[in-house]
Amino acid sequence: MLMPKRTKFRKQQKGQFAGLSKGATFVDFGEYAMQTLERGWVTSRQIEACRVAINRYLKRRGKVWIRIFPDKSVTKKPAETRMGKGKGAPDHWVAVVRPGRILFEVANVSKEDAQDALRRAAAKLGIKTRFVKRVERV
């Protein structure tokens, strides 16, 4: 699972989802990519499941880049615990994604293979995504 090596604070506030993605909106490394259409949290387990799905489909062909990192801790209180008594312990890590964010990039494979691999990975996520290809920027 992906998680930060160390953080300044163990617990974080929920934060806001408003607006579009501020960075990583273009295909910079590969030829094809998966781009978000919705906002939400992507957990480190979902990222790992997507990575495994892409790699299993491509079978050592091509190269894969993961463009998101789960750097936000999500806390959870134990089951059957009364309210109050402070915030719960850190439970898992998530990456905050907004519309337009590139999640995964693929290179050195055909368009059909890239589409199939990224479609299989998109099924592991709880947000809508689309397939995009690289466009030359000036």
From Swiss-Prot:
Alphabetical list of InterPro entries matching this protein: Ribosomal_uL16, Ribosomal_uL16_bact-type, Ribosomal_uL16_CS, Ribosomal_uL16_dom, Ribosomal_uL16_sf
GO MF annotations in UniProt: rRNA binding; structural constituent of ribosome; tRNA binding
Protein keywords: Ribonucleoprotein, Ribosomal protein, RNA-binding, rRNA-binding, tRNA-binding
Entry-linked PROSITE patterns: RIBOSOMAL_L16_1, RIBOSOMAL_L16_2
Cited SUPFAM superfamilies: Ribosomal protein L16p/L10e
A GO BP annotation: translation
GO cellular component, one term: cytosolic large ribosomal subunit
Ranges annotated as spanning the membrane: none
Entry function: Binds 23S rRNA and is also seen to make contacts with the A and possibly P site tRNAs.
Alphabetized NCBIfam families for the sequence: rplP_bact (TIGR01164)
Similarity-based family: Belongs to the universal ribosomal protein uL16 family.
Assembly, per entry: Part of the 50S ribosomal subunit.
Protein name per Swiss-Prot or TrEMBL: Large ribosomal subunit protein uL16
Origin species: Chlamydia pneumoniae (Chlamydophila pneumoniae)
